[in-house]
């Protein structure tokens, strides 16, 4: 796994992680769909910020470039300093916020354990953002 955090805004020991998206509507990035769509990028970035920078993760959002969509993701409902540019259903109470971060960490640990155990199953529907295998000549996945 690899990734690059686009932006981290900090204030008073807290951090808001921002991931810019181009060409996509970010409504599909609402926190309510993260588990169903196995979408843990922003949560993982928040964990990295906590661990490496020693800051409290106060939110992780996907921001559209060149569109007027509202940022989507998750923000801590107890942090007013983030402003009001977020949908109410992306604001989570502290225990739910932490549970999403724990879920993301569990996903990464589970993937790591499977890879270390030699399990490299193919899943063409999840392979590329629009479905379909990215490397059909080497994938060996049977249709």
Task: Outline where the language-model segments fall.
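RecB-family 4Fe-4S metal-dependent nuclease core
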Residues: 1-143
